[in-house]
Amino acid sequence: MASSVGNVADSTEPTKRMLSFQGLAELAHREYQAGDFEAAERHCMQLWRQEPDNTGVLLLLSSIHFQCRRLDRSAHFSTLAIKQNPLLAEAYSNLGNVYKERGQLQEAIEHYRHALRLKPDFIDGYINLAAALVAAGDMEGAVQAYVSALQYNPDLYCVRSDLGNLLKALGRLEEAKACYLKAIETQPNFAVAWSNLGCVFNAQGEIWLAIHHFEKAVTLDPNFLDAYINLGNVLKEARIFDRAVAAYLRALSLSPNHAVVHGNLACVYYEQGLIDLAIDTYRRAIELQPHFPDAYCNLANALKEKGSVAEAEDCYNTALRLCPTHADSLNNLANIKREQGNIEEAVRLYRKALEVFPEFAAAHSNLASVLQQQGKLQEALMHYKEAIRISPTFADAYSNMGNTLKEMQDVQGALQCYTRAIQINPAFADAHSNLASIHKDSGNIPEAIASYRTALKLKPDFPDAYCNLAHCLQIVCDWTDYDERMKKLVSIVADQLEKNRLPSVHPHHSMLYPLSHGFRKAIAERHGNLCLDKINVLHKPPYEHPKDLKLSDGRLRVGYVSSDFGNHPTSHLMQSIPGMHNPDKFEVFCYALSPDDGTNFRVKVMAEANHFIDLSQIPCNGKAADRIHQDGIHILVNMNGYTKGARNELFALRPAPIQAMWLGYPGTSGALFMDYIITDQETSPAEVAEQYSEKLAYMPHTFFIGDHANMFPHLKKKAVIDFKSNGHIYDNRIVLNGIDLKAFLDSLPDVKIVKMKCPDGGDNADSSNTALNMPVIPMNTIAEAVIEMINRGQIQITINGFSISNGLATTQINNKAATGEEVPRTIIVTTRSQYGLPEDAIVYCNFNQLYKIDPSTLQMWANILKRVPNSVLWLLRFPAVGEPNIQQYAQNMGLPQNRIIFSPVAPKEEHVRRGQLADVCLDTPLCNGHTTGMDVLWAGTPMVTMPGETLASRVAASQLTCLGCLELIAKNRQEYEDIAVKLGTDLEYLKKIRGKVWKQRISSPLFNTKQYTMELERLYLQMWEHYAAGNKPDHMIKPVEVTESA
């Protein structure tokens, strides 16, 4: 605030006394300017006693008393000056200063304005008026006051800088910038303007320009404390920590007891990972300023990082005692409560932080994250959007919102969020990892691998990224450093389990790695506990369950829960089961977790179940569970486990008295809320029951089932063309299938019936033989027409009124037949030439996804191919990017590239049908073909397997045991190779085994859905009777076998 000291008026006394008076006046002025107010007052009083009416002396006395905060005395002398000269603008201005200091702003403003009316070019008056208007909240008026001052003197660089400050405060950054630049133009060495300009650039996000201007300010004024602090702050934000430390240390050399600078310096130490130094520096800041909530909050952050959570919690609470509305402390304390599992308190604190500070982006994001974990996705999304609205460059919020959108199945939205997060912060490892997960789920594996590698480069200790990268590399069969990778992955899981953290390996992937059974079970258990955490916040009381069947008219109500009622392998397996239950004893409910996909698979289940409920329309797990409970379900069946689309929270709420795992997930749930796992003796031997959290409930033959007889009845029979006419009949070179096959064959001349002998499916497979009749079409004009259709790539021809179609063209003829939704109505021709398979070689095949192959499996297959020289291995491009890796590893093992033939993934019907062309299927021991095993067996192709220790590695053995083909089950690697080699070199033996599989698929229980349903019903009744008797779940490993006529 400018005080006007005035000029000493001319004296009428003689010259000698006048000189003495003038000299004393100048001395008083100099003392005033130097801040020696005591001496200035003493000399002024001498002057006043000599000339009591001298307005210059009166103004100087007014200013001296004002500086000494003797406001009444200051006002007194200003008033005396006005009495002497009512037009003295400076006196009114000085009086205005007194009023302003007393808080009487309107009186101050009136006096300043009066001074300016008296003296329109009074610069100090404008400056004082501007300050008073700012204090009164009239910012625009203050701007005009500064502008008026500058109109009278454009070279007032200090005033122009002050105007810039005001414009900056109003958010008018470009105008502020212009002011500072003009001030610098007027006075290039004006350090304050350089510093202020740096603040503008910082506010505009021009970090490097800000740094440059702050550095210029401290160069011009090496003792400019605020500029050093500003420089340190912007360097801290730019993460240039060493230079930030230097700036703060220089500031402390100028002001050693500056608590805020100590606090900021501690923040830099914290970011540098110098936690102990940060803690010490925060403590120094608190020592200097005990009522410093920011320092307590930041100290708590450092203590938490060090693991001193209890002490950190105390510090947050201290900060809140000092300032109950300290939003950062509320937010950070909420984070601790969340990590402690006290979710309700965390939510309360986040909401309190937002109540205090609605524009708190981090609190919005954190609250959203908790809401997402609770399954409240829409509310979470709302808070993420708020966080981003408040802070458009909040990369974490974008990344986390992407996670929510991903969970809501909005893949494009999630992709955009992750991409934006990375644009904002290219070094954001979590966002790269999240982006990778979207690519992975979308099947863009190379992009996923690249993003995971970027994440790990940015953050080497990143278990989630490492384990997901390992899975991606498994998918494409990239086995570089395979053994080392497996060791590291196991050690990551061990460390996470020891620290009670959620493992980075997903339960569904755990079967692929050399983990112990205990680890696999613990991984599943952690995921089960997550479901419990989500439902705990609902505060739902336990459901009461019936102990009898009175309310259901004596019928057992079974509820099947799945996200896969549609075009999905699970429906391909079980779609007929709901409609085959005995309606007198069972009432069937199917609960869909996914919307209608418009396929016949969905239509069939909807039509044949007694009740079909689309729970995808009830996103709230509590309400969905209520619906299940209201339906009075006795046995609730989980067909998802931890596969995509699961809602295990429904089971965690226990809406049914008995809950069982079945079919859709190849492992234990690890969850206390699942009572049984429906399995069989071969898949889950009783001696490994400890692998499962559930009790084992055995089916008498196999827990696996396939609806192939219903979906693909046209493959029950086949005919072949004797294309070589050399007396050797091949059953899998040119194959014809069709519902009308017999009628078509009857219309042809010269069709021969060849009897193929095959062993029975008893315990002793070689004890007796039965004959199978296989129609053979000789090479004639009709056969030639069929072969010409294939060679020319024609879609379809007509022979004797029958439509004969090219097996590669099913999607063009009838797409629903291609997907397995309808039975093809044409005669379909399938040939080895369609897939580039050699006519005169043994074809081994495997139609699994490539992730099921590991180095030891490929080595076994290479050994087999070497021992069977005239043989090839037929695999799928599943995915295509895995093909070059497999080929390269095979070449390293001594196999030429032409020994492995890849085909694209095919529609379901073609996929099953073309399996007839292979001679032998080689199963993957790591994780068997489950649905694909059923597919290849329905095609009549023998499958060699070697059961391991996991459920996923024993399913094929269970299928083969049910089929009666024990000779195809190996006990070890050598036996696996020997069985495959015998099939490839002993063609008579191969023919017998192929005949056996062809026969047994019809006569064994493996594809008998009616018998399977009856056995499943018997198991359900066992479970119910056990429960109704008041017993806890127990193993049911003595299944009651039933026959179809039972």
Curated annotation (Swiss-Prot):
Which stretch carries the motif Nuclear localization signal? 487-503
Major localization class: nucleus
Give the TPR repeat ranges.
21-54, 89-122, 123-156, 157-190, 191-224, 225-258, 259-292, 293-326, 327-360, 361-394, 395-428, 429-462, 463-473
Question: Would the keyword Repeat be found if you checked this record's keyword annotation?
Answer: yes
Where does the record place the modification Phosphothreonine? Answer: 454
- Annotated residues for binding of UDP: 849, 852, 906-908, 911-914, 930-932, 935
Q: How is it modified after translation?
A: Ubiquitinated by the SCF(FBXO31) complex, leading to its proteasomal degradation.
Q: Kindly state the subunit structure of this protein.
A: Monomer; may exist in different oligomerization states in cells. Homotrimer, oligomerizes via TPR repeats 6 and 7. Trimerization is not necessary for activity in vitro, however it increases affinity for UDP-GlcNAc. Component of a THAP1/THAP3-HCFC1-OGT complex. Component of the NSL complex at least composed of MOF/KAT8, KANSL1, KANSL2, KANSL3, MCRS1, PHF20, OGT1/OGT, WDR5 and HCFC1. Found in a complex with KIF5B, RHOT1, RHOT2 and TRAK1. Found in a complex composed of at least SINHCAF, SIN3A, HDAC1, SAP30, RBBP4, OGT and TET1.
Function noted in UniProt: Catalyzes the transfer of a single N-acetylglucosamine from UDP-GlcNAc to a serine or threonine residue in cytoplasmic and nuclear proteins resulting in their modification with a beta-linked N-acetylglucosamine (O-GlcNAc). Glycosylates a large and diverse number of proteins including histone H2B, AKT1, AMPK, ATG4B, CAPRIN1, EZH2, FNIP1, GSDMD, KRT7, LMNA, LMNB1, LMNB2, RPTOR, HOXA1, PFKL, KMT2E/MLL5, MAPT/TAU, TET2, RBL2, RET, NOD2 and HCFC1. Can regulate their cellular processes via cross-talk between glycosylation and phosphorylation or by affecting proteolytic processing. Catalyzes the transfer of a single N-acetylglucosamine from UDP-GlcNAc to a serine or threonine residue. Acts on cytoplasmic and nuclear proteins resulting in their modification with a beta-linked N-acetylglucosamine (O-GlcNAc). Glycosylates a large and diverse number of proteins including histone H2B, AKT1, ATG4B, EZH2, PFKL, KMT2E/MLL5, MAPT/TAU, NOD2 and HCFC1. Can regulate their cellular processes via cross-talk between glycosylation and phosphorylation or by affecting proteolytic processing. Probably by glycosylating KMT2E/MLL5, stabilizes KMT2E/MLL5 by preventing its ubiquitination.
Protein name, per record: UDP-N-acetylglucosamine--peptide N-acetylglucosaminyltransferase 110 kDa subunit
Q: Look up and give the organism this protein is from.
A: Oryctolagus cuniculus (Rabbit)
The record lists the lineage as: Eukaryota, Metazoa, Chordata, Craniata, Vertebrata
